[in-house]
Curated annotation (Swiss-Prot):
The lineage of its organism: Bacteria, Pseudomonadati, Pseudomonadota, Gammaproteobacteria, Enterobacterales. GO terms for molecular function: 2 iron, 2 sulfur cluster binding; dihydroxy-acid dehydratase activity; magnesium ion binding. This is Dihydroxy-acid dehydratase. Gene3D superfamilies: IlvD/EDD C-terminal domain-like. It comes from Klebsiella pneumoniae subsp. pneumoniae (strain ATCC 700721 / MGH 78578). The keyword Iron applies.
Length: 616
């Protein structure tokens, strides 16, 4: 029988000092035999996805205490990728994932907490907490802040839906008037919550459902809706049950590594491909799998991407649907239900509610459930009122979207495409693979060949795009922006958005060893591995080299002979200490970022730290 971890600090005469300090936090004698549960919050006023989380930790804590546990809350950092985008701040985004994971480990292990409730929401916070949860392997439930309502405004006598990406594109488009750009900017992000499309934050919160670590509705129920409060209340109750199951009944099935098994990771990736999720999810799932000591690699993702269709298309791949529409169509369980009927899921997995996948679908899939309360929950909709308050409205759609032929979520027979929303490409400068979000690629450019325009920083590429130096047919190559080379693997949302602004969204390709925002669409290929700074062949590409992209055949090729590539590699190595570094880039890199770069691996490994360098 496992012993409560917290007993280390609450039992025995030698722990009198620790108990004295616990008493100073409000604990009494009656509390010293109870499980101590960490409420891991991420409230900050910097991030709209987290601005409403201040009081939600207290909600969870009250339920933990009522159920017989002791709740102790702490906070992690949270970086807003949208605000950090397009300047030096983006260097810090991905490294913050490791800091978040480490900070959770530090707090939980230093104080011997028995379990956790993780209150996350945005791009690197959910992955960081997920990595920590699987590293620590103590009972955990995730409950995120929820998606933002889609923005809406009237343009050309039509009401259109908006999000952050629209504001960026319109702001950079010289054909758009100042008045219209201002109107879109003021309408794009109307409420608290994670940005309203299938961007990285919402993709990851959906994947926690598929991994079994969060409750039904977590990924799609709006941040502003009153129904979301139940997820927080239930999380507080349920974590105490999970904790007692493990420590008092010796039931290891309550542990996250046994819930988020390899089968669950495969289901999560299957969901991601089917819903056209962010390419960043590949990075984060690979990293989380390593923390869980699961053999889940790019090869597994490649195999899944070849057989899973796209059943859901959401902004930024279309402006017709946002997360509020996914929820109305049944949310994550609606998509999983269609995948299950297509025979594409592992059915033996369980979730934090203790339900198997078939049991979960029977209760929560809107296409089969007989539960009116579940149907009511999935009719929770937007209010269209600007607010930063959680649970501030209770509007509902009159009906569910159960149209699986032409609705937001489709059945296998009516799939948006037989190929899924993500694909892994391989070639002679991406030997370990690269990722493209096919959900956002126009059919006309699934095969594309063009001359390279090479840039050794995102800033130089943006200047060239806005300066008219990139023209129709070009393949923009941005390198030395990987985990080590950036450092920090910047997102390239500005270059892709500006290509659209210049009318080149369907006329050019962009390739990088950096990554893309979940808001990116177009022929945008990222995560090229090995990265330039690690000796990858992307460092050998020169202006004018022809590059051939063939998504249907999962191929990407630099059209040079092996002999020419070898000669360029020899020339690069001859640079000595300057080999595999940018030639003409001025970038100030802090000590903290240099420390990150010294251990960073390429994207095909999840951009995690290289344990071998630490003797691990």
């Amino acid at each position: 029988m496992p012993k409560y971890r917290s007993a280390t600090t609450t039992h025995g005469r030698n722990m009198a000092g620790a108990r004295a300090l616990w008493r100073a936090t409000g604990m009494t004698d009656a509390d010293f035999g109870k499980p101590i549960i960490a409420v891991v919050n991420s409230f900050t006023q910097f991030v709209p996805g987290h601005v409403h989380l201040r009081d939600l930790g207290k909600l969870v804590a009250e339920q933990i205490e009522a159920a017989g546990g002791v709740a102790k809350e702490f906070n992690t950092i949270a970086v807003d990728d949208g605000i950090a985008m397009g300047h030096g701040g983006m260097l810090y985004s991905l490294p913050s994932r490791e800091l978040i994971a480490d900070s959770v480990e530090y707090m939980v292990n230093a104080h011997c907490a028995d379990a956790m409730v993780c209150i996350s929401n945005c791009d690197k916070i959910t992955p960081g907490m997920l990595m920590a949860s699987l590293r620590l392997n103590i009972p955990v439930i995730f409950v995120s802040g929820g998606p933002m309502e889609a923005g809406k405004t009237k343009l050309s006598d039509k009401i259109i839906k908006l999000d952050l990406v629209d504001a960026m594109i319109q702001g950079a488009d010289p054909k758009v008037s100042d008045e219209q750009s201002n109107q879109v900017e003021r309408s794009a992000c109307p409420t608290c919550g994670s940005c309203s499309g299938m961007f990285t934050a919402n993709s990851m919160n959906c994947l926690t459902e598929a991994l079994g670590l969060s409750q039904p509705g977590n990924g799609s129920l709006l941040a502003t809706h009153a129904d979301r409060k139940e997820l927080f209340l239930n999380a507080g109750k349920r974590i105490v049950e999970l904790t007692k199951r493990y420590y008092e009944q010796d039931d290891a099935s309550a542990l996250p590594r046994n819930i988020a098994s390899k089968a669950a990771f495969e289901n999560a990736m299957t969901l991601d491909i089917a819903m056209g999720g962010s390419t960043n999810t590949v990075l984060h799932l690979l990293a989380a799998a390593q923390e869980a000591e699961i053999d889940f690699t790019m090869s597994d993702i490649d195999k899944l991407s070849r057989k899973v269709p796209q059943l859901c298309k959401v902004a930024p791949s279309t402006q017709k649907y946002h997360m509020e529409d996914v929820h109305r169509a049944g949310g994550v369980l609606g998509i999983l239900g269609e995948l299950d009927r297509a025979g594409l899921l592992n059915r033996e997995v369980k979730n934090v509610l203790g339900l198997t996948l078939p049991q979960t679908l029977e209760q929560y899939d809107v296409m089969v459930t007989q539960d009116d309360a579940v149907k009511k929950m999935f009719r929770a909709g937007p209010a269209g009122i600007r607010t930063t308050q959680a649970f501030s409205q209770d509007c509902r759609w009159d009906t569910l979207d159960d149209d699986r032929a032409e609705g937001c979520i489709r059945s296998l027979e009516h799939a948006y495409s037989k190929d899924g929303g993500l694909a892994v490409l391989y070639g002679n400068f991406a030997e370990n693979g690269c990722i493209v979000k096919t959900a956002g690629v126009d059919d006309s450019i699934l095969k594309f060949t063009g001359p390279a325009k090479v840039y050794e920083s995102q800033d130089d590429a943006v200047e060239a795009i806005l300066g008219g130096k990139v023209v129709e047919g070009d393949v923009v190559v941005i390198r030395y922006e990987g985990p080590k080379g950036g450092p920090g693997m910047q997102e390239m949302l500005y270059p892709t958005s500006f290509l659209k602004s210049m009318g080149l969204g369907k006329a050019c390709a962009l390739i990088t060893d950096g990554r893309f925002s979940g808001g990116t669409s177009g022929l945008s290929i990222g995560h090229v591995s090995p990265e330039a700074a690690s000796g990858g062949n992307i460092a050998l590409i020169e202006d004018g080299d022809m590059i051939a992209i063939d998504i249907p055949n999962r191929s990407i090729q630099l059209q040079l002979s092996d002999a020419e590539i070898a000669a360029r590699r020899e020339a690069q190595e001859a640079r000595g200490d300057q080999a595999w570094t940018p030639k003409n880039r001025q970038r100030q890199v802090s000590f903290a970022l240099r420390a990150y770069a010294s251990l960073a691996t390429s994207a095909d490994k999840g951009a995690v730290r290289d344990k071998s360098k630490l003797g691990g």
